[in-house]
Amino acid sequence: MNHVVLSGRNISMKYGHRLVLDDISIDIRAGEVTALLGPNGAGKSTLLKLLCGEVPSHNEIDYFGEPKEAWKPEEIAKHLAMLPQHSTLTFPFLAREVVELGAIPLSLSNKETTELALHYMQKTDVLHLAESLYPALSGGEKQRLHLARVLTQLHQSGDKKILMLDEPTSALDLAHQHNTLKIAREAAKAQNAAVVVVLHDLNLASQYADRLVLLHNGKLVCDDNPWQALTPERIEQVYGYRSIVTKHPTLDFPQVHAAA
């Protein structure tokens, strides 16, 4: 079994009087893609933000066996990168310059930074936009650009690498959805990264993730492999939706279809 690199114990979170996360414990392992799933308002993005430290909390969270509080921000930034669901960047940077921001925690020359940024821009299919102004890009182009940025950030992470992606396919067309998740899976399998991704598409999650964590009303309902997690009974429990689950005709993963 792959070793645990991120763990959270008894995680709870309130917004006002609303309990958003209710006593969740979770382990994230190197070499695996873990998908956080659930309906709107289930707590997926909040859990991701708590795990990466974006939202301050007193919950017990460890990175690589050490408490979150023991890590200096400039050090954990070399090993943990977070792709947010939305970017608030409004300055007229060139697309290439946005990706180069990912190299801030790294020890690189200007030339090395640019070369690295262009490498990851090619990987995420935005190299042709390198000299374009960021505000002029489409939502999907911005999403792929920021993926290149967080990949750049983790370039010098060595054998300690956590990649967190919050709905990275939400603005993407079909081909780029699959390419993005192939990149995530490659990071896990080829680089032994721990990848955590928030998704809404159960079939994409089933195809690319090793583990599916299903949340409902702030509670962890299931943490298992796709075949065990995606049963018609559990899908109806979590989503209130009747479904049929079949095997993909050529690949070994379950597919979810409407029951009627």
Curated annotation (Swiss-Prot):
Name used for this protein in its record: Hemin import ATP-binding protein HmuV
Higher taxonomy: Bacteria, Pseudomonadati, Pseudomonadota, Gammaproteobacteria, Vibrionales
Name of one Pfam family that matches: ABC_tran
CDD domains: ABC_Iron-Siderophores_B12_Hemin (cd03214)
Gene of this entry: hmuV
Segments forming domain ABC transporter: 6-242
Residues where ATP binds: G38, P39, N40, G41, A42, G43, K44, S45
GO terms for MF: ATP binding; ATP hydrolysis activity
EC number: 7.6.2.-
Highest taxon of the lineage: Bacteria
